[in-house]
Curated annotation (Swiss-Prot):
Gene: pnp
Residue ranges of coiled coil: none
Name assigned to this protein: Polyribonucleotide nucleotidyltransferase
Compartments, as annotated in UniProt: Cytoplasm
Annotated family: Belongs to the polyribonucleotide nucleotidyltransferase family.
Chief localization: cytoplasm
Enzyme Commission code: 2.7.7.8
Amino acid sequence: MFNYYRKEIEWGGRPLVLETGKIARQADGAVVVTYGDTVVLCTAVGARSVKPGQDFFPLTVNYQEKAFAAGKIPGGFFKREGRPSEIEVLNSRLIDRPIRPLFPENFRNEVQVVATVLSHDLENDPAIAALIGCSAALTLSGIPFFGPVAACRVGYADGAYILNPTLPEMKESALDLVVAGTSEGVLMVESEASELSEDVMLGAVTFGHEAFQAVIDAIISLAEHAAKAPWDLAEPSAEEIALKQRIDTLGRAAIAEAYQERVKQQRYKKVGAAKEAVLAALATEGLDVTAAKPILKDLEADVVRSAVLDTGYRIDGRDLKTVRPIVSEVGILPRAHGSALFTRGETQALVVATLGTAQDEQVIDALEGEYRTNFMLHYNFPPYSVGECGRMGSPGRREIGHGKLAWRAIHPLLPGKDTFPYTMRIVSEITESNGSSSMATVCGTSLALMDAGVPLKRPVAGIAMGLIKEDRGFAVLSDILGDEDHLGDMDFKVAGTESGITALQMDIKITSITPEIMKIALGQARDGRLHILGEMSKALTEGRSDVSSTAPKITTISVPKEKIRDVIGQGGKVIREIVEYSGAKIDINDDGTIMIAASSEDQATRAIERIRGIVAEPELGAIYTGKVVKTADFGAFVNFLGARDGLVHISELAQGRVAKTTDVVNQGDVVKVKVLGFDDRGKVKLSMRVVDQQTGADITESVGERPGRPAR
């Protein structure tokens, strides 16, 4: 019944198993990947025909995590998986980026790749297993695919690289790097690092590329037994070849002339006009205008790429290494806690920092368990930033991915909660875009956080590198434009400080690049990053000495652990009363640390005094101001130290004989009392008789102590 095949290898100290032929047999390709006890089902399905008028490659990658994989039931009212989580979106992109360049250039059939996490052992990352499985599924499917591709995760600790570190090991690693590629070279890199050098980062990429060669061999071995017959790819017809030559004759010179314009919007108009002229000419000649559009795109790319390689100059007139002009401004929004406007050429980011309390932390429900984060970065790319009309709404995959890249760049430089107990939210609004908006977000975020008074260890900057590679040579471009990104072969983003790299993301549009090119790009990126940091320093070089006057002021105090219950009170009654009385927000940790967030010093003082009053122990002989909370025949109960009450015996109410308690005090009276001692149950014995009720002075010597009662 099953045409089952299995391939197992030892990889990174545990078995990696690839299986096919038992599950999802109606998909073009289906592979179950098991790594440790993490299991991922990966499928690939392709449409056999192209939709009419299709002029792009419709590849969709969906990575999905099932709650049952970790023995959990989804939360919420419906108790089932809903919209993709952030990690699902990020891992979908992680799989998409290395496989997309490996389809034939003119392939337009719809392809859908799905990775479903079926089991998660809470040690082995399902994203790596998913990427390997999707590559294997495509390799087996018969869909035109120039793979296989494989991937691994690389850590770095104690001067050594770690292959596929477990989730607990990642907590001790100075590097979290994912590298993917073919047997020939690297296709994709994604990383977060603790200010590591270019040599260490390049070494990690090389280490990873060598490490996953065994996986590529395993996929090939599985394909030798289980692969389906490859699809036939139609060769270009004589008519298509003739059409391409005709378009080249009609359009090359006009498009090259249009690209002499250095202002983006004007250039787009001229290039668009040149293309329309070519299409109009083809229509009058009776040629296929629909088929001509993708050929025109290829011609446009060839014109731009050839100009860079032939002249060493780019669309906007810069040489290969020059960074566009930079203007940095901070404190531009009066009520924001921190703000910055970072402009680099025709790319601009308005970045705003908001400070909150522990109550504002984001709670993330992941397969690994629920955890909290006090740093959020949200990247928005409205259509007006490129002069277009478009959809406005929830963030798309690209916005989530760009925001996470900037988050990785900044995260290693943030202060610890013990020194800066704030929750930080960053919003980056891209107000203009002509390439490298995610790196503008990194620069703007660094400035906005420092403007908000966040003590960053060092400022962070980012730069996007590009590549033009042909048989006759290559050129590495610094600070690429949008057109250079679209028409080039590489988008290589590098962020870091003057001390080292904190984030790196590389996407390749060709089959691979060499270590030589990566080394040149990293060196050129370092020069560009240091230049950008110098320009940013003209606005701000370090965090302001204090947070904004509009931000909450957080004060941290500690109380004994055994006193936490007293501060909270039964059912939270006491803490609610303190919040209502002071107007401050209060967070209590299990270790006895209490964080008080207040909009004014008075609010903080009121909350601190009330808490200290609750946890303080009465001092023998000390005098306190209190309030009578209850009267009885034998005396009065006085609340004198936070929530603590004590008894003033009727004999200690006044100097003379007192016949009735209410002759001296009534409920609600404010009185001054002295601590005389404690009974055998710890109850406090108080006296009003030995305290001057006007001045609060101790008058024991003048009135004398009350003699004790004779023994019965």
